Amino acid sequence: MEKVFEKLMYASRWIMAPIYLGLSLILFALGIKFFQEIFHLIPNIFEIAEVDLVLITLSLIDITLVGGLLIMVMFSGYENFVSQLDVGESSEKLNWLGKMDAGSLKNKVAASIVAISSIHLLKVFMNAENIANDKIMWYLLIHITFVLSAFAMGYLDKITRK
C-alpha cells in the first residue's frame, strides 16, 4: 500500500506540466501586447512627446522582463519539479538549464520582480504630476518591500548554504 501511495504521489508531479505549458500561452499573449504597443507607436512616432516615448519604452521593457521571468519559471520549474528537459547539447541550449535549483530560482525570481517593480516605479515617477501623492507613497513602499524581501531571501539562502 505504501509503495503504491509513494508512486502515485511521485507521478502527481506531472500535474504541473500543463501548468508550465499554460505559462507559454501567457508568454504568447505578452508578445501580442508587445507588438500591439509598437504598432500603435509607429504611426505616431513624429507626434509623440519624448516623455511619452520613454514611458512606452519602459512599458516594453516591463513586458520583456515579465517574459524573461516566465521563461525562467517555466524551464526551471519544469526541471526542478517535473522532469529534466532533454534538448540535447546544441549551441541553442541555455547554459543555465539543469543548473538552477529551487533556491537559485527563488532568488532570480525575486531579483526579476525587483527589476520589474523598478521599471514600474520609474514610469510612476515620470508621470508623477498625474498621480496622487498617497499612491506614489504606496508604490514606493511596495517597491521597498520587494527589495527588502529579495535581499532577505538572498541572505537566508547564503547562510543556509554554508
UniProtKB/Swiss-Prot annotation:
Entry keyword set: Cell membrane, Membrane, Transmembrane, Transmembrane helix
GO CC field: plasma membrane
Major place of residence: membrane
Topology relative to the membrane: Multi-pass membrane protein
Transmembrane domains' residue ranges: 15-35, 53-73, 136-156
Residues spanning the signal sequence: none
InterPro entries referenced in this protein's UniProt entry, alphabetically: UPF0114, UPF0114_bac
Recorded superkingdom: Bacteria
Location(s) in or outside the cell: Cell membrane
Keyword Metal-binding recorded: no
Pfam families, alphabetized: UPF0114
Coiled coil (residue ranges): none
Annotated family: Belongs to the UPF0114 family.
PANTHER family in alphabetical order: UPF0114 PROTEIN YQHA (PTHR38596:SF1)
Name of the featured protein: UPF0114 protein Sden_0436
Organism for this UniProt entry: Shewanella denitrificans (strain OS217 / ATCC BAA-1090 / DSM 15013)
